[in-house]
């Protein structure tokens, strides 16, 4: 009887402790992996002139698909359509690449002019309400989430640097972060509620942009959405490590499996440092996918058997396409062969992941 009484007393106490721990976890500020706290480099010389800000894109996000006219596999580029597409999105991609480059320059050089220039670029677009149009198609909403991931990922290095470079720029920081929050909320609307047959690498990249925005703006709701999208993705990975919706890309199936990995590895790495371990989701789906891709890079025969097509290896010859190896090997004890593949291709720099991926995932905290 005494034991039973003690159990009745202990259980509510344990439950209360668990609830309190949960509340503390929920209240904790969101953080990036340790490398994002790296100090700004020692000042080297004077900054050059600040390039002109690309005109803020405030128009309709209805763009031509570079696969226009292709069959359901969406694997054959339409050269004429691609040229039109590149012309339509030039200001957006100039912004992504240019702002990321300016942040990288500042983190390396410590020149105040580079910081002022980067913040001017971003705050100009923020004040204009760029990329917020409600008039969009699939290609347009894809550009919105890619740009958000690029810009918020680069800005994150400024936000969390131990040098506190944003301390003297509170107003611009607020404008930029409010803009990111608006875009993040829109990206969630854009990519929520899709049927499983429509959820592919685009949704994964949307989830990465929302995860990056969540950490920059300390928005737990955005963080939770990104984690939930990761879980959907993980449960699309089959027992052999294939993504059925990417196998539909036929001759580009292997390339698209590889393209799915950067956002998923980044989300998992960011979730991990915020107390959410996604490595075992669907019995280690991320690891199965990564290993399947690297085996395919060595020998594409399995992908050829699955798709009935010779694989287009063009993208897979570009080192930066493997930038996912940095967050991935921060999560897992990578086998020697994978570590060698990573080392051979480093340093990784991907503007869609915010710039210097190798630097922010280095053991030395970015040095």
Curated annotation (Swiss-Prot):
EC numbers: 4.2.2.3
Enzyme class: lyase
Residues reported in the UniProt entry to bind substrate: 65-66, 138-139, 256
Biological process terms in GO annotation: alginic acid catabolic process
Predominant place of localization: periplasm
Subcellular location: Periplasm
MF terms (GO), sorted A to Z: poly(beta-D-mannuronate) lyase activity
Gene3D superfamilies registered for this protein in UniProt: Chondroitin AC/alginate lyase
Signal peptide: 1-27
A Pfam family hit: Alginate_lyase
Alphabetical UniProt keywords: Lyase, Periplasm, Signal
InterPro entries: Alginate_lyase (IPR022859), Alginate_lyase_dom (IPR008397), Chondroitin_lyas (IPR008929)
Catalytic function, reaction form: Eliminative cleavage of alginate to give oligosaccharides with 4-deoxy-alpha-L-erythro-hex-4-enuronosyl groups at their non-reducing ends and beta-D-mannuronate at their reducing end
GO cellular component terms, semicolon-separated: periplasmic space
Role according to the record: Catalyzes the depolymerization of alginate by cleaving the beta-1,4 glycosidic bond between two adjacent sugar residues via a beta-elimination mechanism. May serve to degrade mislocalized alginate that is trapped in the periplasmic space.
Family: Belongs to the polysaccharide lyase 5 family.
Protein name: Alginate lyase
Species assigned in the record: Pseudomonas aeruginosa (strain LESB58)
Organism taxonomic ancestry: Bacteria, Pseudomonadati, Pseudomonadota, Gammaproteobacteria, Pseudomonadales
């Amino acid at each position: 009887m005494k034991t039973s009484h003690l159990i009745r007393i202990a259980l509510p106490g344990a439950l209360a402790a668990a609830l309190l721990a949960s509340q503390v976890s929920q209240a904790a500020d969101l953080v990036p992996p340790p490398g994002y706290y790296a100090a700004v480099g020692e000042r080297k010389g004077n900054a050059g002139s600040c390039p002109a800000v690309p005109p803020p894109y405030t128009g309709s996000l209805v763009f031509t698909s570079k696969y226009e006219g292709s069959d359901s596999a969406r694997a054959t580029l339409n050269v004429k359509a691609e040229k039109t597409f590149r012309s339509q999105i030039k200001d957006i991609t100039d912004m992504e690449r240019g702002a990321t480059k300016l942040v990288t320059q500042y983190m390396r050089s410590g020149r105040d002019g580079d910081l002022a220039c980067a913040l001017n670029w971003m705050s100009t677009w923020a004040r204009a309400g760029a990329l917020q149009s409600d008039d969009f198609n699939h290609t347009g909403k894809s550009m919105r989430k890619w740009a958000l991931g690029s810009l918020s990922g680069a800005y994150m290095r400024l936000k969390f640097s131990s040098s506190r470079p944003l301390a003297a720029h509170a107003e611009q920081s607020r404008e930029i972060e409010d803009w990111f929050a608006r875009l993040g909320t829109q990206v969630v609307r854009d990519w929520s509620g899709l049927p499983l047959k429509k959820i592919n690498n685009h949704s994964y990249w949307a989830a990465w942009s929302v995860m990056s925005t969540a950490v920059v703006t300390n928005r737990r709701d955005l963080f939770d959405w990104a984690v939930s999208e990761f879980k959907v993705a993980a449960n699309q990975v089959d027992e052999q490590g294939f993504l059925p919706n990417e196998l539909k890309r036929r001759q580009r199936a292997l390339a698209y499996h590889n393209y799915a990995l950067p956002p998923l590895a980044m989300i998992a790495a960011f979730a991990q440092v915020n107390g959410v371990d996604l490595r075992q989701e669907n019995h280690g789906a991320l690891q199965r996918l990564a290993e399947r891709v690297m085996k395919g890079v060595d020998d594409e025969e399995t992908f050829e058997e699955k798709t009935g097509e010779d694989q287009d290896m063009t993208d897979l010859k570009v080192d930066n396409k493997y930038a996912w190896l940095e967050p991935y090997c921060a999560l897992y004890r990578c086998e020697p062969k994978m570590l060698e593949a990573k080392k051979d291709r480093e340093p990784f720099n991907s503007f869609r992941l915010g710039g210097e991926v190798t630097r922010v995932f280095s053991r030395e905290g970015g040095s």
